[in-house]
């Protein structure tokens, strides 16, 4: 009888431990060079013209990926696509990954894996991987849309949408969903969204656009 109890306890440990090691959650932000909170008429007019560039960032509050703890660390993906992001692409997107400079070698590899898992094909063609200090702060403003990101040559600063002041056509909604998987986020205004690096041979600087998302991510 004692033998069967021991086996049962061993089996219970085996099935519980991986579940605890696999969870990861944190904060998420993205900004694009087109409005994501917009009306269909404006979105249709911008398709294939704007929205080909974006900055995405994940900051881990707690958890592990591939059995590597990532608490407090962040990773950023800077994306340049051939077509408006959120639409079918005619060619592969290019990306630059910026990894938290505090990460160890194992954590660096796990953070790169996190970005690739969450962004999928958007980071399928990585042209550069850089280490940098990453500052990612989400403030406690009324509607939760205020955040700031600085990572190398990439910067995002957002504010909450004002349902009255920020309307143009009157039937705005979150026309384009977030680019990352496993996120809960709300649209926000990008006060500033810029990338001044050299990896793409192109830079961008955008401001006061309804083109951001601020929220959280969770992988179970």
Tell me the role of every PLM-derived stretch.
Residues 98-217:
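Mature, soluble, non-transmembrane domains
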Residues 22-99:
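N-terminal Sec/ER secretory leader and immediately downstream segment
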Residues 1-4:
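Positively charged n-region of N-terminal signal peptides that target proteins for export
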Residues 6-16:
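Bacterial N-terminal signal peptides
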Residues 16-22:
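Sec/Tat signal peptide C-region and signal peptidase I cleavage site
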């Amino acid at each position: 009888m004692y033998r069967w109890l021991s086996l049962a306890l061993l089996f219970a440990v085996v099935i519980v431990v991986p579940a605890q090691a696999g969870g990861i959650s944190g904060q998420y932000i993205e900004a694009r060079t087109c409005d994501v909170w917009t009306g269909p008429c404006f979105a249709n007019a911008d398709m294939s013209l704007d929205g080909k560039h974006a900055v995405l960032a994940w900051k881990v509050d707690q958890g592990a990926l591939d059995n590597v703890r990532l608490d407090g660390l962040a990773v950023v993906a800077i994306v340049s696509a051939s077509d408006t992001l959120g639409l079918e692409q005619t060619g592969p997107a290019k990306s630059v990954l910026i990894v938290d400079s505090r990460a160890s070698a194992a954590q660096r590899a796990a953070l790169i894996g996190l970005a690739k898992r969450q962004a999928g094909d958007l980071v399928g063609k990585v042209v550069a991987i850089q280490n940098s200090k990453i500052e990612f702060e989400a403030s406690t403003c009324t509607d939760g849309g205020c955040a700031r990101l600085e990572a190398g040559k990439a910067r995002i600063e957002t504010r909450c949408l004002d349902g009255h002041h920020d309307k143009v056509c009157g039937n705005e909604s979150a026309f384009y969903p977030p680019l990352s998987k496993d996120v809960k986020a709300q649209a926000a205004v990008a006060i500033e969204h810029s990338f001044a690096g050299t990896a793409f041979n192109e830079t961008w600087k955008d401001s006061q656009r309804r083109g951001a998302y601020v929220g959280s991510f969770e992988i179970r």
